[in-house]
């Protein structure tokens, strides 16, 4: 099918929202997402059917093709016919490796349905559970595709009955997850049911697949599958692919089970839009109204070497046209659209307009970042934006980088800036003391890929330090009230600190409690769910990005209101670098009990207020059993039953903890936790001790206190690395 014709068809169909489906392909790493996408693209005439499954068209970065994993979420609009009608399917292929799960979270926001790909042999892995949970939290309806069914025949040599049992077991596990994480009103309706047709069995690599209704209609059963793989020649396999093409099975199911934007936005907008649902913007979104005001949710920023920054996202209402002026809610500025296009894999095809319900790529919004909301400029005073995206992981590993050739320094700084625009989970910082450029990522692979992108896209070779694990500082007890004085002695603050309980940390981390919410609503939740005193909770005035809160319990302090912004800035600065090892502070409640403020503004500027606030917080911190928190990783390991002992030995050696061991057929599943600091050579150790027969997944689990037995050693090493004095600060150092 000639490509220009497809683009024309796609553009004309986009206007009929009942014919649009926004779907993503999500899975654990290596379960076959990109191969599945390729097979779908081949059917739409976008890549040659002969190379589908090997072309990895959506893995268009060379780093992806070399490593065989998807790093970026790639978009494409497909044309598909079902029951005589044409449909536009906006397809997003997302990364499965846990280091890139931030990109999955962003792409889910713009989808209405997801194809969950599961390897028939490996079954449900850590990342499958994570992405399915994220999908359900965003009210994205799942369809199941059990891929690599050929492995059950070729590798495990199962009989038809054993194959059926294995497949039913995977379906049961997926339904358990839907039951666990789905919302009450969707659970029943979204359960996976083979009879209904929302589960596909197949092999993306060999291009065949079917649902039960399709198999019954075409007279196919599992015996045909076994015959195709046990036959001496390939003709039976080709016959199977011709009789049950995978693209037909998957796209027909997507059209039948994934709602169109009009249906989906009615129940998804109340979940993801935080703002009044009765205003004109919200009403237009609830109806996916192409004639309403524009609301464009940006999920991805890409640097195009020829065109500059390209913003990709979903049009929830209105119609995007070039020349249109939009207000960027987070950046608080307006910008004009220079060009509107849609993605066909790595290439962008120009479009005159893209209406509500579709995915668009836009030039001109170079001040936007991932997670930005762009709206019609006349609505800039309307309160509301999309709910903050919750990333399952956070950056936990850091390296220092410098260019091999010192002349490349400005080029490297510019390239790092561009990389961090494209990937908000990559944090770039400058160490003020040493002048080093620090790069923090979600894991070792995330940083490796970023360095490879620096080399390939920007031609910069860099020298790096070995990876450093990121820590947090925290406390385990309540402090007394300490007085912090400003350097000129004219301002005094009386503050105390105490640890936040686990429930409060959870409520803030998952976005239930936000700094910008109504104080009464916040106080009610904290009282009912986290045992707070209602009046104290009502007086929370700041929550920072590392889950620390500031409570103002003062009454009638003169001039406090005029300096409160400076006080809060001082609080945020203190939380960025704690006294133990200059690592960020996490999980601390700071209470302001009283203050004395000088009446003359000249004597109460930031240079006076910041140190006074910081000193009393740090004095309290050092008397409250301070500790370091280290990032802990969850491991999900599958291994033949006779090798359990080898795996548990590796985990125990790395300060790990076995959480669960279960048996599935002749494979054992081990769930465990280990500190990220011990995981650097985990892959080679596991491979070595099991002869390469273990496969596993990892994800960020939680922050946990460093054991007391090694605490001082870890703190000393961090202080040495940062060039800080060897001896720890004392309380007296902060009390002048």
Swiss-Prot record:
Q: Where does GTP bind?
A: 27-34, 93-97, 147-150
Taking the first listed entry, what is the main subcellular location of this protein, grouped into a coarse class? Answer: cytoplasm
Q: Which GO terms describe its cellular component?
A: cytosol; ribonucleoprotein complex
- Write down the CDD domains for this protein, in alphabetical order: aeEF2_snRNP_like_IV, EF2, EF2_II, EF2_snRNP_III, Elongation_Factor_C
Q: Which InterPro entries match?
A: EFG_II, EFG_III/V, EFG_V-like, EFTu-like_2, G_TR_CS, P-loop_NTPase, Ribosomal_Su5_D2-typ_SF, Ribsml_uS5_D2-typ_fold_subgr
In the record, Diphthamide modifications are located at 603
Q: Name one GO molecular function term.
A: GTP binding
| The keyword Ribonucleoprotein belongs to this UniProt entry's keyword annotation | no
Q: Which UniProt keywords apply?
A: Cytoplasm, Elongation factor, GTP-binding, Nucleotide-binding, Protein biosynthesis
Q: What does this protein do?
A: Catalyzes the GTP-dependent ribosomal translocation step during translation elongation. During this step, the ribosome changes from the pre-translocational (PRE) to the post-translocational (POST) state as the newly formed A-site-bound peptidyl-tRNA and P-site-bound deacylated tRNA move to the P and E sites, respectively. Catalyzes the coordinated movement of the two tRNA molecules, the mRNA and conformational changes in the ribosome.
Protein family according to the UniProt entry: Belongs to the TRAFAC class translation factor GTPase superfamily. Classic translation factor GTPase family. EF-G/EF-2 subfamily.
Annotated protein name in UniProt: Elongation factor 2
In the UniProt record, the gene name given for this protein reads: fusA
């Amino acid at each position: 099918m000639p490509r220009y014709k497809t683009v024309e068809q796609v553009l004309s169909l986009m206007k009929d929202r009942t014919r649009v489906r926004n779907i993503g392909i999500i899975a654990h790493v290596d379960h076959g997402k990109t191969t599945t996408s390729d097979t779908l693209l081949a059917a739409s005439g976008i890549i040659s059917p002969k190379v589908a499954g090997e072309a990895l068209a959506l893995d268009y970065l060379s780093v992806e093709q070399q490593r065989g994993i998807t790093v970026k979420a790639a978009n494409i609009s497909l044309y598909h016919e079902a029951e005589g009608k044409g449909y536009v399917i906006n397809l997003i292929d997302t990364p499965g490796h846990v280091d890139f799960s931030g990109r999955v979270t962003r792409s889910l926001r713009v989808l209405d349905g997801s194809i969950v790909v599961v390897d028939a042999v490996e079954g449900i892995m850590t990342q499958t559970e994570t992405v399915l949970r994220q999908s359900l939290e965003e009210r994205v309806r799942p369809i199941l595709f059990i891929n690599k069914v050929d492995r059950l025949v070729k590798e495990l040599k199962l009989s038809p009955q054993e194959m059926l049992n294995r497949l039913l077991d995977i379906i049961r596990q997926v339904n358990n997850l839907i039951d666990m994480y789905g919302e009450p009103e969707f659970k029943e309706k979204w359960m996976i049911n083979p009879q209904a047709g929302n589960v596909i069995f197949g092999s993306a690599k060999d291009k065949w697949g079917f649902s039960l209704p399709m198999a019954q209609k075409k007279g196919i059963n599992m015996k045909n599958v076994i015959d195709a793989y046990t036959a001496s020649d390939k003709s039976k396999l080709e016959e199977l692919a011709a009789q049950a093409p995978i693209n037909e099975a998957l796209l027909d199911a997507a059209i039948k089970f994934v709602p169109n934007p009009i249906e989906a936005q009615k129940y998804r907008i109340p979940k993801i839009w935080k703002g009044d649902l009765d205003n004109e913007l919200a009403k237009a979104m609830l109806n996916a109204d192409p004639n309403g005001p524009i609301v464009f949710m940006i999920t991805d920023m890409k640097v195009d070497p020829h065109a500059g920054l390209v913003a990709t996202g979903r049009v929830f209402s209105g119609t995007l046209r070039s020349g249109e002026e939009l207000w960027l809610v987070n950046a608080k500025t307006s910008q004009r659209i220079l060009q509107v296009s849609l993605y066909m894999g790595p290439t962008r095809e120009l479009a005159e307009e893209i209406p509500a319900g579709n995915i668009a790529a836009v030039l001109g919004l170079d001040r936007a970042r991932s997670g930005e909301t762009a709206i019609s400029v006349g609505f800039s005073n309307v309160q509301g934006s999309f709910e903050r995206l919750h990333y399952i992981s956070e950056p936990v590993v850091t390296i220092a980088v410098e260019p091999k050739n010192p002349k490349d320094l400005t080029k490297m700084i510019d390239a790092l800036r561009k990389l961090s625009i494209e990937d908000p989970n990559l944090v770039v910082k400058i160490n003020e003391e040493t002048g080093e450029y620090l790069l923090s990522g979600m894991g070792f692979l995330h940083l490796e890929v970023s360095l490879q992108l620096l080399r390939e896209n920007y031609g910069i070779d860099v020298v790096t330090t070995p990876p450093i694990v990121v820590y947090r500082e925290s406390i385990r007890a309540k402090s007394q009230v300490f007085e912090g004085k400003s350097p000129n002695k004219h301002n005094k603050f009386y503050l105390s600190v105490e640890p936040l309980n686990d429930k409060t940390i959870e409520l803030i981390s998952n976005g239930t409690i936000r700094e910008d919410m109504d104080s009464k609503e916040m106080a009610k939740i904290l009282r009912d769910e986290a045992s707070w005193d209602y009046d104290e909770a009502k007086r929370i005035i700041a929550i920072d990005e590392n889950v620390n809160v500031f409570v103002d319990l003062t009454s009638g302090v003169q001039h406090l209101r005029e300096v409160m912004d400076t006080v809060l800035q001082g609080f945020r600065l203190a939380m960025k670098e704690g006294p133990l090892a200059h690592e960020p502070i996490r999980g601390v409640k700071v209470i302001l009990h009283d203050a004395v403020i000088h009446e003359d503004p000249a004597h109460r500027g930031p240079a006076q207020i910041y140190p006074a606030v910081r000193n009393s917080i740090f004095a309290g911190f050092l008397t409250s059993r301070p500790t370091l928190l280290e990032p802990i990783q969850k491991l999900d390991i599958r291994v033949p039953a006779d090798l359990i002992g080898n795996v548990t030995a590796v985990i125990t050696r790395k300060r790990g903890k076995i959480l669960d061991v279960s048996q599935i057929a002749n494979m054992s599943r081990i769930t465990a936790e280990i500190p990220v600091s011990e995981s650097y050579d985990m892959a080679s150790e596991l491979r070595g001790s099991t002869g390469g027969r273990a496969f596993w997944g990892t994800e960020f689990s939680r922050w946990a206190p460093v054991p007391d037995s090694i605490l001082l050693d870890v703190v000393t090493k961090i202080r040495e690395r940062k060039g800080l004095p060897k001896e720890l600060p004392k309380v007296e150092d902060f009390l002048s």
